[in-house]
Structure formats: C-alpha cells, structure tokens
UniProtKB/Swiss-Prot annotation:
The record marks 193 as: Important for recycling of cargo proteins with the sequence motif K-D-E-L from the Golgi to the endoplasmic reticulum. The keyword Transmembrane applies. Receptor for the C-terminal sequence motif K-D-E-L that is present on endoplasmic reticulum resident proteins and that mediates their recycling from the Golgi back to the endoplasmic reticulum. Residues 25-32, 80-92, 136-149, 200-212 are cytoplasmic. It comes from Rattus norvegicus. It is found in: Golgi apparatus membrane; Cytoplasmic vesicle, COPI-coated vesicle membrane; Endoplasmic reticulum membrane; Endoplasmic reticulum-Golgi intermediate compartment membrane. The record marks 5, 117 as: Interaction with the K-D-E-L motif on target proteins. This is ER lumen protein-retaining receptor 1. Its main location: Golgi. Phosphorylation by PKA at Ser-209 is required for endoplasmic reticulum retention function. The gene is Kdelr1.
C-alpha cells in the first residue's frame, strides 16, 4: 500500500467519524442528507460483499467492516434515532436518477461480467455521484454548518488522494483501472466549487454560505 492510499483511507475515515460525532453530540442530523448516506450505505454493501470470499489483509478486512458498520449506523441515526431533526423538506434530490443509470452502466461497462464484479463496478459509479443529494441540499438551504463543511472537505480530500494513488500505481506498478480513475475524476470535479468556498470561507472562520 502506498502513502496516498493510506492517507486517502484516513481522510475517508475522518470524514465518517466527523459526521457520526456531529450527529451524536448535537443530537441532531439537521443539514445532513439522509439520501446521500443511504447511497453510501448501498455503495459499501455492494463493494464489500466479497468480504466473505476474498481475503487480502487484516487492514483491508477491518476497513471494509468499519465502512459498512458506520454507514448503516449513520442511516439509523438519521431515519430512526434522531428522525425528528431530519430536514426532509430540503433533502429532495431524486436518487433514482443516480441509482438507475449507474446500475445500467455497471452492466454495460465492467471488467468482468460476474455478479461480484458488476456490484463492485456499480459501487464505483454510484460513489462518484452519491454526494450530489448532500450538495443539492446545501444549495437549497444556502449554507452548511462548519462541521458539515469539514465532513465534505475530508471526503473531497479522500477522493483527490485516491487519484494520486492511481497515478502512483500506474507509474510504479503498471496498474491502470480506467473505471475507477474516471469515476474518481467525476467525483473530484463535483467537489471543486465546494473546495473553493471551504478554503476562502470556512478556513477563515466564516460560515459556509452559497452566493445568492
């Protein structure tokens, strides 16, 4: 494992922990898109079904379990534990516009037409756009809490580091995965505007608010 992959995993884990702590400490999921969190739970479930059939390393297995457990814990908090604080009025993105196209694309463009490989490919495609309901929610409310901004920034850093991971692997290992790279680029592009706002506002102690 190279440094970019490791730092990317840490950034991803940090994002998840920040979100869980935000919800638990505030006893509220206000400002958090439940739809994005459901999509992430679907992503990790589809991607890590090989948990029972393919052992790579203890680190790899532990991270898979953590991602799945945390994603479903987050969904449970939003739709059950703190349901009264969930802002469903602003969380209105039509997720079928993300799930259906990525599922169809996974059947058409994949590395190997087997159930686990199709599910893995579907998870890669879906993850690249799973944050859209959250970004859409922020655009509707016009602002985001600081801790939510930190969560989104950590996710963006995770994807950016993974792009460097792919470059590293291609250069030193000759490994090239076009599906993962293109999906990663799409996901990183979606964060670009947010990165700018985060750097110019949140890091200066201001609340992230979108231009009118």
């Amino acid at each position: 494992m190279n440094l970019f992959r490791f730092l990317g995993d840490l950034s991803h884990l940090l994002a998840i922990i920040l979100l869980l702590l935000k919800i638990w400490k505030s006893r509220s999921c206000a400002g958090i898109s439940g739809k994005s969190q459901v999509l992430f739970a679907v992503v990790f479930t589809a991607r890590y079904l090989d948990l029972f059939t393919n052992y790579i390393s203890l680190y790899n297995t532990c991270m898979k379990v953590v991602y799945i457990a945390c994603s479903f814990t987050t969904v449970w908090m939003i739709y059950s534990k703190f349901k009264a604080t969930y802002d469903g009025n602003h969380d209105t993105f039509r997720v079928e516009f993300l799930v259906v196209p990525t599922a169809v694309l996974a059947f058409l463009v994949n590395h190997d037409f087997t159930p686990l490989e199709i599910l893995w490919t579907f998870s890669i495609y879906l993850e690249s756009v799973a944050i859209l309901p959250q970004l859409f929610m922020v655009s509707k409310t016009g602002e985001a809490e600081t801790i939510t901004s930190h969560y989104l920034f950590a996710l963006g850093v995770y994807r950016t580091l993974y792009l460097f991971n792919w470059i590293w692997r291609y250069h030193f290992e000759g490994f090239f995965d076009l599906i993962a790279i293109v999906a990663g680029l799409v996901q990183t592009v979606l964060y670009c505007d947010f990165f700018y706002l985060y750097i110019t506002k949140v890091l200066k102690g201001k609340k992230l608010s979108l231009p009118a």
